[in-house]
């Protein structure tokens, strides 16, 4: 047998291995956690893979079919920790449990897969990241257009979008960053998705439009999808149906909290491709970290729901002027109250994900406790919001709600502190159910009964060593020292002899044991029943609870932006339909937070008179920072945030493009020059007059003449055809002559000065052209040997006098 062959026909396999292989054949592309007593074991290739990923010992389990069986395992009680690590690595796991009693007379225990865990279908908080959405996605191509569907089971969000080109789809994949991505077996554009960690090929039948339509209407309990803005034959139905079908295959048979599907119109938001997102370091830095990003500065939300929502906003800045102005208005109104509100919001749990687990009936006892705590503080929050006289704030207030009935139920039914699961009881509070109280009382009073029995018999028999004990093997027993065994009456039945003691039982004790154990199991069974009834009682309120969760997350974001505006000295931008961008004494929102010295502010004026600013100056002089801060301020303003400037007026922006070399990725076989040309080509084809374009040193990576010619021609095309708003930095001084040909091109520069072989950067933008590049001075700061620097200075003098070699 090879390690990838799951056939059970070979009679040389042991019964256990046959059972394992049979189960494994049903989940060939997943790791199979196979329970054996107190451990989950993995065999063959699964064992090797898990051993490598988790750095656990790889051992072996004898031979089967004349082959050594590789084996690795983890204890059952720590399995969740290892499962979480594997899921975060992009692995999918089938968990197979023993379902027969351990003491069954059958030699081979019955086992079955009880849950399937994939990166995109998890809802357990142990596997989820607090401030990140957890999307599973599916893609479909038809007539050179793409349909894309996303679903976050942990939140209950389901959306679809339509894309007319590869760049648009790639941008959406990067924005949503799915943890699992499904694609049809005949998908041709694998380069678009092959970089994702967990991609799953699915049969074409999963994307069948008729089957998908039926699945979706059944899911939403509707006769059609017209109410969601989706026509019967629209091709977005295909990937959406594939997601529903796949999730059902993953042992999630019903999704009661998925009640609608949202058609996401990407044209409602500012378009940013993956290159722009990387170079602007909005959510992740170029190195893939979360620190030193726009999100790391702006996202000081106090709830995980708010953290996720703000990151969504940062990834999809709006073009809707009324929406943006409404957010600015609420941020302004909330400024005097942010401390009070944040103090209360810190007590709010992740109600979004709790609601989803309640709908799926996978909520743990702590979810009920956290929901109770959250609902308990809502009245205090509402009292503060009522002080603010605003229609927008009042709408948030109405959505938050009160939920007195649910709160009363949870206070009455759930203990103040609860165990991690309902398995052993201890969750339902006293005085909630009379029968449960009686059963618990019987169990509780058993200790008093046993103590009385022990005192009575000890006195009657005059045996000092007489005592009553309990273990899981023999149950309740009477124990005496061997030296007192002659005093034991004949009615006592000896059940165990140990080194120094003997153990006995009596019918009275056994009968009482049965009553106590029966009461214990009856209590646990009843408690589980009452626990499940809570799901039924809460279910009708779930939609309102989800709306409340969203309102709380939105409030958290807006209050957070209020706090940021005060703490970081931001101003409310003026949003207008007019063309252009005016920023007075603007600052880079990220860089200013990490400088020891005050950030040097700069202004910018992009208008029909100043469409392109050509910026010269030394490396490290501030050119890239200046360009990035303009784009970041636009993004901040368009999500509803105040901005780092003394004054800001921002017109309509439809797209933001960047060509900044620090984001180059040559791992796919592209040279830096090819990357640059590809991105510039994309800009030339897709930018409009309302687009903001940042280009840092166009024309690198080839000869000076080739580079200058390309930079000149591209700049000319952008001015005459695209007519966009452009910030272009360059070391080609010749490029500044474009100002002589176009009245709406202006030259600016960042200056520096040298003194005693040292260079000082002024970081202040001025009108005009930089006289020097200061390249050698900057190079000396990098630690290049002084002898090389001095030689370079001599060569520069020769070059400038045309006496080259």
Curated annotation (Swiss-Prot):
Top-level taxon: Bacteria
An individual GO BP term: mismatch repair
PROSITE patterns linked to this entry: DNA_MISMATCH_REPAIR_2
Single GO molecular function: ATP-dependent DNA damage sensor activity
Keywords: ATP-binding, DNA damage, DNA repair, DNA-binding, Nucleotide-binding
Classification via Pfam families: MutS_I, MutS_II, MutS_III, MutS_IV, MutS_V
Gene Ontology terms: cellular component: cytosol
Residues reported to bind ATP: 617-624
Similarity comment: Belongs to the DNA mismatch repair MutS family.
Function: This protein is involved in the repair of mismatches in DNA. It is possible that it carries out the mismatch recognition step. This protein has a weak ATPase activity.
Protein's name in the database: DNA mismatch repair protein MutS
């Amino acid at each position: 047998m090879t390690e990838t062959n799951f056939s059970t026909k070979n009679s040389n396999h042991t019964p256990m291995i046959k059972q394992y292989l049979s189960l494994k054949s049903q989940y060939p592309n997943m790791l199979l956690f196979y329970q054996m007593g107190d451990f989950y074991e993995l065999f063959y290739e699964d064992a090797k893979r898990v051993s490598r990923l988790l750095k656990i010992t790889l051992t072996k389990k004898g031979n089967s079919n004349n082959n050594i069986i590789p084996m690795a395992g983890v204890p059952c009680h720590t399995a969740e920790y290892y499962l979480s690590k594997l899921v975060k690595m992009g692995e999918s796991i089938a968990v197979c449990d023993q379902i027969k009693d351990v003491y069954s007379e059958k030699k081979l225990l019955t086992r079955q897969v009880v849950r399937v865990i994939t990166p995109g279908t998890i809802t357990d908080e142990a596997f989820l990241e607090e401030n990140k959405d957890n999307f599973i996605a599916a893609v479909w191509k038809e007539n050179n257009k793409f349909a894309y569907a996303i679903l976050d089971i942990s939140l209950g969000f389901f959306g679809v979008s339509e894309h007319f080109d590869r760049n648009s789809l790639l941008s959406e994949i990067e924005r949503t960053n799915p943890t699992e991505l499904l694609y049809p077996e005949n998908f041709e554009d694998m380069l678009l998705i092959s970089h994702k960690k967990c991609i799953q090929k699915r049969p074409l039948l999963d994307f069948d439009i008729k089957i998908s339509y039926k699945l979706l209407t059944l899911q939403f309990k509707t006769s059609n999808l017209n109410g969601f803005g989706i026509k019967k034959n629209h091709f977005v139905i295909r990937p959406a149906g594939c997601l529903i079908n796949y999730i059902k295959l993953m042992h999630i048979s019903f999704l009661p909290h998925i009640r609608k599907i949202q058609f996401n119109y990407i044209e409602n938001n500012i378009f940013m491709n993956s290159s722009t997102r990387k170079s602007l370091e909005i959510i992740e830095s170029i190195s893939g970290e979360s620190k030193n990003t726009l999100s790391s500065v702006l996202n000081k939300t106090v709830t995980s729901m708010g953290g996720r929502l703000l990151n969504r906003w940062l990834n999809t800045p709006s073009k809707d002027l009324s929406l943006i102005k409404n957010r600015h208005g609420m941020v302004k109104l909330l400024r005097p109250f942010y401390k009070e509100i944040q103090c209360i919001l810190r007590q709010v749990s992740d109600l979004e994900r709790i609601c989803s687990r309640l709908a799926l009936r996978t909520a743990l006892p702590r979810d009920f406790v956290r929901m109770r705590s959250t609902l308990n503080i809502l009245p205090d929050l509402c009292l503060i919001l009522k002080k603010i006289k605003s229609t927008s704030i009042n709408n948030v207030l109405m959505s938050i709600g009160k939920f007195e009935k649910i709160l009363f139920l949870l206070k009455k039914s759930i203990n103040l502190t609860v165990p991690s699961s309902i398995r052993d009881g201890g969750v339902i509070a006293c005085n909630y159910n009379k029968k449960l109280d009686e059963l618990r009382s019987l169990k509780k009073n058993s200790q008093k009964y046993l103590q009385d029995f022990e005192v009575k018999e000890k006195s009657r028999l005059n045996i000092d060593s007489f005592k009553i004990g309990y273990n899981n093997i023999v149950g309740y027993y009477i124990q005496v020292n061997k030296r007192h065994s002659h005093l034991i009456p004949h009615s006592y039945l000896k059940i165990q002899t140990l080194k120094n003691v003997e153990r006995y039982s009596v019918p009275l004790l056994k009968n009482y044991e049965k009553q106590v154990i029966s009461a214990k199991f009856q209590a646990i069974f009843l408690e589980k029943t009452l626990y499940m009834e809570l799901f039924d009682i809460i279910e009708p309120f779930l939609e309102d609870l989800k709306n409340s969760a969203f309102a709380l997350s939105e409030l958290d974001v807006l209050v957070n932006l209020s706090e940021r505006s005060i703490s970081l000295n931001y101003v409310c931008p003026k949003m207008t339909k007019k063309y252009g961008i005016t920023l007075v004494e603007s600052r880079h929102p990220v860089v200013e937070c990490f400088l020891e010295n005050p950030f040097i502010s700069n202004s910018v004026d992009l208008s029909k008179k100043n469409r392109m600013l050509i910026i010269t100056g030394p490396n490290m002089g501030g050119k890239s920072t200046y360009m990035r801060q303009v784009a970041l301020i636009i993004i901040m303003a368009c999500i509803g945030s105040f901005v780092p400037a003394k004054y800001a007026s921002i017109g309509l922006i439809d797209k933001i493009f960047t060509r900044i070399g620090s984001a180059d990725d040559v791992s796919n076989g592209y040279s830096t020059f090819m990357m640059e040309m590809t991105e510039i080509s994309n800009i030339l084809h897709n930018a409009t007059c309302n687009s903001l374009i940042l280009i840092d040193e166009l024309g690198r990576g080839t000869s000076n003449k080739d580079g200058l010619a390309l930079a000149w021609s591209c700049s000319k095309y952008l001015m005459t055809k695209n007519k966009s708003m452009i910030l272009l930095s360059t070391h080609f001084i010749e490029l500044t002559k474009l100002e002589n040909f176009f009245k709406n091109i202006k030259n600016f520069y960042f200056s520096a000065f040298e003194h005693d072989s040292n260079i000082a950067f002024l970081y202040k933008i001025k009108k005009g052209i930089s006289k020097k590049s200061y390249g050698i001075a900057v190079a000396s700061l990098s630690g290049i040997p002084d002898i090389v620097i001095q030689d370079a200075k001599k060569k520069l003098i020769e070059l400038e006098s045309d006496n080259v070699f």
